[in-house]
Amino acid sequence: MITRLLSGSIKSKGLSYKLLDELNEELLEDVDIFVETGVYSMIPANILSKPRICSLGFHETPLPEGKGWAPIRWTLENNKKHLVVSLYQLSEKLDDGGIVYQVNVPISKGDHYPVLETKRQKGIQECFSLFLDELQSGVLVIRPQTGEECFSDRRFKHSSELDATKTLKELWDEIRVCDLERYPPYFVLDDIKVVLNYKVIKLGDI
């Protein structure tokens, strides 16, 4: 999905691109900029240094805050009003390169996982499109990350378990960050597991 959005932005600017099914130095010959999406492992230095200009990636937190996994969860846990999409230069360290562009995507208290995921994708597309505009105007500014560094842990299936002693209002941020199809929220009651399914409806629409 993200790849399709980015390729659409590239084509709309009249630029050329190629999609890579694997990472090797030969495939990056004659490439100016390499952009990774959906790569969940560190990319070797020989790959990152191959493009003529730079290698870039996206992370949905205001780097250096929220490095690592589960950026949407980090955003909610830290009571942020926006999902911040950072386009940054890839390096040998995790989420450590300079910032190329950042976009703030407003989020509301009623946004649950499908809405948050859609906003994330649109934020990435907007961020990338604005970056391309600047690039075509002859501008490419890479700023060092500033601020306090912190990391977010990886989510697993058990990360969707809720504390049954808390109220639904207290649990809402934990509930809405769960993917209902893959990792639905649940709680354990004595010897049974209760899996939650829900729908968000604005009161004015009832």
Task: Tell me what each language-model feature is.
Residues 1-206:
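One-carbon transfer enzymes
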